[in-house]
Amino acid sequence: MSTVTFDQISEHEQVMFCNDPHTGLKAIIAIHNTTLGPALGGCRMLPYKSEEEALTDVLRLSKGMTYKCVAADVDFGGGKAVIIGDPRKDKTPELFRAFGQFVQSLNGRFYTGTDMGTTPEDFVQAYKETSFIVGLPEEYGGNGDSSVTTAFGVMQGLRAVSQFLWGTDVLTERVFAVQGLGKVGFKVAEGLLKEGANVYVTDVDPETIAKLEEKAYQYPGHVQAVTADDIYGVGADVFVPCAIGGIINDETIERLKVKAVCGAANNQLLEDRHGKVLQAKNILYAPDYIVNAGGLIQVSDELYGPNKARVLKKTRALYDTLFEIFQSAEKKAVSTVEAANQFVEERLQKRARLNSFFSPDNPPKWRVRR
């Protein structure tokens, strides 16, 4: 790995490298911005090809979490953690307990939980070493599976798109192309079928597709499976990416026949400039870090004490935030990416006048779990 310089982390407050030879833990924790409160972000476990690749990922993701926290109006800043390893064979309870010790050493400047390659059960182990864990199973005081709330937030985003483009938030008989049927994507596709929409789907797992096709018989909507490559070119109203990031790029934009892009995947645009490219093609883009903020809202809300009704109320407000950004972009003749980023930066600047970063010596008033 090349030497880490301050230039690489110039936008971040703190980057922590975690190494425990006894358990094999190699992890990086990045804290981007704590203006709003302590950093919050999931921990993913992936077999990165190099430490450099892991660092690039955690820096990018932690910055995205700052924007997501601001847009979701939660009292947290942006952070992220990555564990270098194959989740299929490198996981042990001891590894996650070691990770929990490193989180504890930050003394409340960073809260974490599940992400790609990790599960709530993994963080039950980390919770034995630190209280700064969110997204725990219900039996441990958490709100349970956050994918339910994330999918609910995506549905609110799709309704906001529909209202802005077609003057109604009713999704019946609209056509959607859902890419990825993971924990969130499956629930979104099922929700659309319940609404009476027509849904194209693709996923790497044929069994998951078959499961959705079987469920579709119960609902008024219709589902049709297509290949991973064909999903970009189907005749749909909205493209709904719910898998990997970077899938909106020069090549795929040319193939899209939709009026909007709105989905759960993180970092959907390969580059920010692709927001302008979508705008030039009259394709409305719903910024992903707002659309998929339901899960964040749920796990952050745990610190007030679990309350599912309150979580749904907060998540429902994503509709209004997105609609405001759509209107702002139209009025200013800018892309929705630019409008959303302006929205976030303005809110951060207002809060920065009150406090510039979070210190555990001045704990937030909402902290109820110690």
UniProtKB/Swiss-Prot annotation:
Gene3D superfamilies: Leucine Dehydrogenase, chain A, domain 1, NAD(P)-binding Rossmann-like Domain
EC code: 1.4.1.20
Domain of life, source organism: Bacteria
Positions contributing to L-phenylalanine binding: K68, T114, D115, N266
Protein name: Phenylalanine dehydrogenase
Thermal characteristics: Thermostable. Has a melting point (Tm) of 85.5 degrees Celsius.
Molecular function via GO: nucleotide binding; phenylalanine dehydrogenase activity
InterPro entries with a match to the protein in the record: Aminoacid_DH-like_N_sf, Glu/Leu/Phe/Val/Trp_DH, Glu/Leu/Phe/Val/Trp_DH_C, Glu/Leu/Phe/Val/Trp_DH_dimer, Glu/Leu/Phe/Val_DH_AS, Glu/Phe/Leu/Val/Trp_DH_bac/arc, NAD(P)-bd_dom_sf
Catalytic EC class: oxidoreductase
